[in-house]
Amino acid sequence: MSSPFTEEQIKRYSRHIVLPEVGGKGQLKLLKAKVFLVGAGGLGSPAAFYLAAAGVGRIGIADSDIVDHSNLQRQILHSTKDIGRSKAISAKETLEALNPDIEVVPYTERLTSENILDIIKDYDVILDGADNFPTRYLVNDACVFLKKPLSHGSIFRFEGQVTTIVPFEGPCYRCLYESPPPPGLVPSCQEAGVLGVLPGVVGSIQATEVVKLILGKGEILKGKLLIYDSLNMDFKKVEIHKNPNCPVCSDKATIKELIDYEEFCHAHVGS
């Protein structure tokens, strides 16, 4: 009986194949999987690296930004030669150089209510590494509507958070944060800073969650928020619950279609 793997693949993925929890069947699942990453920045960089190395067959990666000097302290997909170039294109080149066995699809356009459903509909799992609230709510709502599992991660200064959202099986992002903070209340990484190695830890945890979702193995962070304090080297898990009045995923949902998320986040000034 012929092997489903090429000789090169057997060599490349041998450390996976010998794991009973992965094996040949699991590696085939990874090779057939399609994962979409929102952002090729701090969180998207380590997540994309490890998903590509693991052999995820198709990786879509969306980022409308260009590489800046200040990104290089933490966004390891990019190097000095990429300054001024599209992050999505830079990511594609880096990942395909790491693993020519996979396909990387770059999306240089900004994700909006008009295009996101069509873009992510054919992907199996979504990984959110966005650095702004409008995109986080947009991605959450789109994943709920399409019933796509979602790994959400965020970083701020020395702290990171990760949760895994499986629509209608556990809480969504809106169950955790029903409304965004007023604009300006939470400073950006540009304003507050971020420890360069922090997204490496958080993004790698997100990639681990995605691999477990694909394999159907282990316990995922569904209904749990993992909080990492890098300054004090402390991990803690907090239980989170479905909001019975969630406007998107509850029986009383009032949001039935994607909205203007910039306006939604701006509208909560002073609320």
Model-inferred region functions:
Residues 1-271:
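Adenine nucleotide-associated cytosolic modules
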